[in-house]
Amino acid sequence: MERLVSGETTTSSNMKKKKKKVSSTTNPSLPDDLVLVIIARVSILYYPILSLVSKSFRSLLASPELYKVRSLLGRRESRLYVCINMYSYKNGPSWFTLCRKPDRTTTSSNKEEDRSSGYVLARIPIPHSPLTQRYSLAAVGSNIYNIGVTRYHHLTSSSVWVLDCRSHTWRQAPSLPVELFRVSVSVLDQKIYVAGLHQEDGSDSLKNSVTVLDTETQVSDRVAIPCSVSQGKEIFISTSVGGKVNLVTGRKVVDYNPVEGSWEEVGDTMCEFMFSKCFCVVGNVLYSCAIDRVFRWYDTEVRTWRNLECLIGGRLPKLSPRAFVSLADYGGKLAVFWNQGVGDWQMLWCAVIALERRNTCEILGNVEWSDHVLHVPKIRSYYNALSATL
């Protein structure tokens, strides 16, 4: 395998000494190792299409060996996921991944098809997928974590579910040390910080609580927080930027520095454009698309929000205030999802924006492509977007 990955060839004499291993899963004329190297060089955007070829291809695309080869070849890339929760459905959320459509023929006369970006959301059949909440999902490496969720949202939970994005299977990880209500998760240095409300034994009141989950050791511990934070306003949302965990409590933000184990109240500027619940961190920069549908980024040096400017000749997406918007880090780019209603159905749109920092106080965005990627029934629903690395 190492020789194939490095591009070396095997001499005919060695081939005679060693019986060639025949693939029983794909092409009978090719060895398994060679097939793995070939598929590993293909962009992960085409994997949903390849999975339709046969059951053997689906098995190959889910094998850990394939992703080991991708890592050896330096072919690791981000894979964008969308989890859609439809409140009228009782079978759990639906999962989709961004992929490329099959190549269109050059003889196509469909003008609308010719203008298409070529991207689409493909549904992933994931059996027994647990329910999710707005802020219960976090991606670390090739895994997506779903934390503190129950079938009934008004109940507390300490559950930790892990989705292996290689095989698209769920497994249950060790539970948190405490049960939490209304969780919000954020990632910093391969660790997941879980903020939520906790009810102490023998008490009727709920207090803020923070638990850190080490994704490498799968060990979680509670973080000691000041009384003013635990008994103050409820932690609505959280994020991680500037090497700190940022907790929005009421109309103020409290920062936790895990290196120093210290807490600091930093005012209310950061949370000004976070209450729309439409924000994400890309390249250690916090981006937001608030209810006014203006794209902004947070300057941690001077603690102020700045507008995301567009490159000359370009234009950022214009979104309706009524649209449900979700942002995600897509390999260092900003992925934007929003919906538009059309009759009994609605279209889910996606735009990918490349980001370029010109100086300390200016970031420019360039829309690489924008297109509708999915049709779903027009029913009450919400969706989360996030990306794993495979």
UniProtKB/Swiss-Prot annotation:
Keywords: Kelch repeat, Repeat. It holds the Pfam family Kelch_FKB95. SMART domains: FBOX. Residues 24-70 form the F-box domain. SUPFAM superfamilies: F-box domain, Kelch motif. Kelch repeats lie at residues 143-190, 237-284, 286-330. Residues 1-27 are annotated as: Disordered. InterPro entries: F-box-like_dom_sf, F-box/kelch-repeat_ARATH, F-box_dom, Kelch-typ_b-propeller. The keyword Membrane does not apply. It comes from the Eukaryota. PANTHER family: F-BOX/KELCH-REPEAT PROTEIN SKIP4, GALACTOSE OXIDASE_KELCH REPEAT SUPERFAMILY PROTEIN. This is F-box/kelch-repeat protein At4g25710. It comes from Arabidopsis thaliana. The lineage of its organism: Eukaryota, Viridiplantae, Streptophyta, Embryophyta, Tracheophyta.
